[in-house]
C-alpha cells in the first residue's frame, strides 16, 4: 500500500467534500478539478458541491467519461438532470458557473490536464480566471511530472490548490 509507512490514520473521505464546499463557497472563478477517473465517490463529491453552488459540470478525459457513463447507468453516480454538460457547451457559461472534472492528476503527458497546462488542449484553455484543484497526491515516482504541470498552470495565471495546501484528497490506501 502506498501509505503503509505513514504513522497515524487517514482522514475520512467526507472531509474532502466539506473542503470542496469551503472552496466553492468563496470562488468566483471557473473550477477545474483533477482526480482519478476510478474514484467514483470523489467525482460524486465534486458533483454534489457543484450542484450546491449552482455550477454546471463538464467532464474531460476519455477514461473519466467512460467511468461516469457506466457508474451513472448502474446507479453509483448521481447528477441531477442538466448538471452534466458537454465540454463543447462551456463557452455559453460564465466562469463562476462551471466546474470541469478532468483526468491528469498524476501529470501524465497525454492526459487532459497536462495538455491544458501546455495550451495544447482543443477545448479548454487555462486562464487567470481558473482555480485548479489537484484532488489527489502524486503516486511515488510521479512527483516531478505533477510539479511540472503545476508550474505550467501557474505560469498561465491559474490558481492551483493541491493536497499540501488544502484537504482536497485522502488516501484510499
Where in this protein do the model-derived segments appear?
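Acidic/His-rich, metal-assisted hydrolase cores and their charged scaffolds
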Residues: 1-173
Amino acid at each position: 500500500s502506498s501509505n503503509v509507512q505513514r504513522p497515524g490514520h487517514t482522514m475520512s473521505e467526507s472531509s474532502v467534500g466539506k473542503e470542496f464546499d469551503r472552496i466553492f463557497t468563496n470562488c468566483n472563478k471557473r473550477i477545474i478539478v483533477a482526480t482519478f477517473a476510478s474514484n467514483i465517490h470523489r467525482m460524486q463529491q465534486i458533483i454534489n458541491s457543484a450542484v450546491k453552488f449552482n455550477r454546471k459540470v463538464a467532464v474531460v478525459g476519455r477514461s473519466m467519461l467512460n467511468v461516469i457513463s457506466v457508474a451513472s447507468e448502474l446507479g453509483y453516480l448521481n447528477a441531477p438532470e442538466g448538471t452534466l454538460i458537454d465540454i463543447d457547451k462551456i463557452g455559453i457559461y460564465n466562469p463562476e458557473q462551471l466546474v470541469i472534472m478532468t483526468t491528469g492528476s498524476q501529470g501524465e503527458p497525454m492526459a487532459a490536464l497536462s495538455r491544458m497546462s501546455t495550451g495544447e488542449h482543443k477545448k479548454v484553455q487555462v486562464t487567470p480566471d481558473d482555480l485548479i484543484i489537484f484532488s489527489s497526491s502524486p503516486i511515488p515516482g510521479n512527483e516531478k511530472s505533477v510539479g511540472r504541470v503545476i508550474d505550467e498552470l501557474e505560469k498561465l495565471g491559474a490558481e492551483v490548490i493541491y493536497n499540501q495546501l488544502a484537504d482536497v484528497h485522502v488516501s484510499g490506501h
